Amino acid sequence: MADADGGSNLAVLDALDSARTQMYHMKAIVIAGMGFFTDAYDLFCISTVSKLLGRLYYQPDGSTDSKPGALSKTANNMVIGVALVGTLMGQLVFGYFGDKLGRKRVYGVTLILMAACAIGSGLSFGSSRKAVIGTLCFFRFWLGFGIGGDYPLSATIMSEYSNKKTRGAFIAAVFAMQGVGIIFAGLVSMIVSSIFLTYNKAPSYKGNHDLSRQMPAADYVWRIVLMIGAFPALATFYWRMKMPETARYTAIIDGNAKQAANDMQKVLSIEIEAEQEKLAKFNAANNYPLLSMEFARRHGLHLIGTTTTWFLLDIAFYSQNLTQKDIFPAMGLISGAAEVNALTEMFQISKASFLVALLGTFPGYWVTVALIDKMGRYMIQLIGFFMMSMFMLAMGILYDYLKTHHFLFGLLYALTFFFANFGPNSTTFVLPAELFPTRVRSTCHAISAAAGKAGAIVAAFGIQKLTYNSQVKSIKKALIILSITNMLGFFFTFLVPETMGRSLEEISGEDGNTGAGGGGAPAAANAGVGVSASDVSRDEKFPASSTEWQTSMHA
């Protein structure tokens, strides 16, 4: 990329690209990442309480059935899937407004919506089970709507704040907070259910059908678990409101290079030339809309690649997470439903979810953070899809054998989670935040993420039907279908180029170059990309102290 003093890019953007990692970046990761912590907690805690909802609201008094009450297939799919529908719509709406109004202006709205609807979910009361479940679904939809907005905004903000050498790690670190949220969903559910178990002893379902429901204590438990999701969102809101607009949006979209330079001088201890004349030429070369032949020529294949891979990944990833409760009995991690009471079953499901997340899900996210700017996004995504496909195929074919060999089953199951997160679950989030021009970056990330949530909806309303009630033949079929899905993701990855080590303007072609290259080409490697010591040893520095951060946040 050209130098700032005579090249095609703006000095303020070059300064961001070559700035050393400082406290500014760390604070931004935490602020954006806490949104993803909340997202994951809110989306995945429903899996730990859905069986409890079935016992409480779908088991009539005086029941003589051999098994406790369970949500109907329709109710189960709605309770779990409605938040995903809301997420898809929220991604598209907030992604669009993130480009039209600014990243910062709509960023805090997502947290307020998440906090309010998490509380509303726990306060879902009604005179009948239909009223309770219907009210819960209403709040879960709008909770998902807020969660959806966090995807394109957090990814875009982090990519536009980052330097080019460690941009992948920064964006991946924001997304890795999803892993922490999944762990806490299991941990909080486990703690709350265990506290209520201590003071509310009850026989198993076999011992006494009615007493095993543990009413009214059990009715408080699921409500508390859902409402706890509001606290991290509220705790982060103040800091989000203090974040400055990204320099890239201010300069390129608002057309105010002087303001962008002034903002960054409060964050970077340097003098930056405003370059208003260069900005006019810069914008003239990039003033094409999303729905244009120019965009299709430059980025059409890239958008197809990011949408298809995220769609296919989320079919597998959400199937894994949302159907855990149905697969755990086959792995020997939880007792049969009739052998335990309501809160003991919830505790066992939560404990199993926590262990799988801690040992399989969580490490994969952070291995990606460590290696994404060394191996590249492209290779990590290929490896992840391939390994997920192989492990799921093995589990599907050997399912009957694995049911009696719990350790091996658990190991294979955990490895699929590891390679999902050290793989496409992380990279499909990172790549759309880097590939597309500033003018449509948030929208394109939103379209890609919405395609992913469409895959999650397929998982919730389709794959879940196969695993419902832990039927052996159906689970085997589901695992083989997911193996094929992952292999398709492997092949569609060839449409997505490598972005490692280059500036956002170079990747998107905004600096006058041709952009990221054709689909399937690891463009960074082909272009001889690398970051020299001089790129990161310049005098531009982010503030090291929290005082300087506070100053920059008020800019």
Curated annotation (Swiss-Prot):
A UniProt-annotated Pfam family: Sugar_tr
Induction annotation: Specifically induced by the mycorrhizal fungus G. intraradices colonization in roots.
Biased composition, class Polar residues, residue ranges: 544-555
Keywords associated with the record: Membrane, Phosphate transport, Symport, Transmembrane, Transmembrane helix, Transport
Gly residues composition-biased segments: 512-521
Region (Disordered): 506-555
UniProt GO molecular function: phosphate transmembrane transporter activity; symporter activity
Transmembrane residue ranges: 29-49, 78-98, 106-126, 131-151, 168-188, 217-237, 299-319, 352-372, 378-398, 409-436, 443-463, 478-498
Signal sequence coordinates: none
Low complexity: compositionally biased ranges: 522-535
Recorded superkingdom: Eukaryota
GO cellular component: a single term: membrane
Any one GO BP annotation for this protein: phosphate ion transport
Keyword Transport (UniProt): yes
Major subcellular site: membrane
Its membrane topology: Multi-pass membrane protein
Subcellular location: Membrane
Extracellular side: 50-77, 127-130, 189-216, 320-351, 399-408, 464-477
Residues on Cytoplasmic side: 1-28, 99-105, 152-167, 238-298, 373-377, 437-442, 499-555
Note from the entry: Although related to the sugar transporter family, it does not transport sugars.
Stated family: Belongs to the major facilitator superfamily. Phosphate:H(+) symporter (TC 2.A.1.9) family.
Function field: Symbiosis-specific regulated inorganic phosphate (Pi) transporter. Probably involved in symbiosis-mediated Pi uptake in roots colonized by myccorhizal fungi.
Name of the protein in question: Inorganic phosphate transporter 1-11
Organism: Oryza sativa subsp. japonica (Rice)
Lineage: Eukaryota, Viridiplantae, Streptophyta, Embryophyta, Tracheophyta
Gene behind this protein: PHT1-11
